[in-house]
Amino acid sequence: VRSRGLGDVYKRQGDGYFESVILDPDGNRIECVYKKEQECPPEGNHVIETERLILRPFTENDTEAVFNCCQNPNLGNNAGWKPHDTLEESLKILQTIFIPQKDTWAITRKEDRLLIGAIGILPDPKRENSNAGMIGYWLDEAQWGKGYMSEAVCAVLDYGFNKLGLTLISANCYPQNKRSQRVLEKMGFTYEGILHQAEVSYDDKIYDHLCYYLEKNNLK
């Protein structure tokens, strides 16, 4: 028999999809795991494995783990979004952003599958080049200083350049977010300047963005 699992293309049918399908030698389906559409990751989201991490699509089952991370003001205030107040708020973020958004992953530890952060690549809104992307990420404060984010960023850069065919990947962070700056510099990003008054946050504060970029031929 042959099986198709999380790393394969999901087969959609009706209001959901087959997450895992077992076929007999003639290709007939003999066993499957079916999930509703809201739990289905967008087409093209692949599982990425590193030495210590598994980057996988988000599901609604991640609601509590996302809330546990994102209720921390030290995380949200460094990333530009309001700290989560309720599980319902975290679920809404999952349903409207993390789950439907292509090339967005939950960062989980291999050792215990604990969700510790998020990472993704989006089209760069500041550049007209369709082969330019923008990377964004956050990490649970309890996991800071362990090298997890550098490991995840390295894997997603490889995916962006070599799987998506991007020629440039950018990143922005607040001037006070020194940890994010160190990650980008470690990965070989070049600092290209300050975009002044770039963002009005949820609490009506105006922030500058430090802007970085990395071209494919400079990937470490």
Task: Report residues per predicted region.
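Single conserved hydrophobic/aromatic residue that forms the stacking wall/gate
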Residues: V1-L6, Y10
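A short, aromatic/hydrophobic, helix- or strand-capping loop or linear motif
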Residues: K11-R12, N78-P83, D103-R109
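Short beta->alpha transition motifs characteristic of CBS
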Residues: G14, V21, C32-Q38, G120-P123, ...
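A short helix-loop-beta-strand connector motif used in the catalytic cores of GNAT acetyltransferases and
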Residues: G16-F18, L94-T108
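An amphipathic alpha-helix signature
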Residues: F18, E60-F67, L87, L91, ...
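Short, glycine-anchored, charge-dense loop/turn motifs used at functional sites
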Residues: P25-I30
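Acyl-donor (CoA/ACP) binding surface of acyl/acetyltransferases
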Residues: E43-N74, T104, T108-K220
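Conserved GNAT-fold acetyl-CoA-binding loop/helix
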Residues: N74-T96
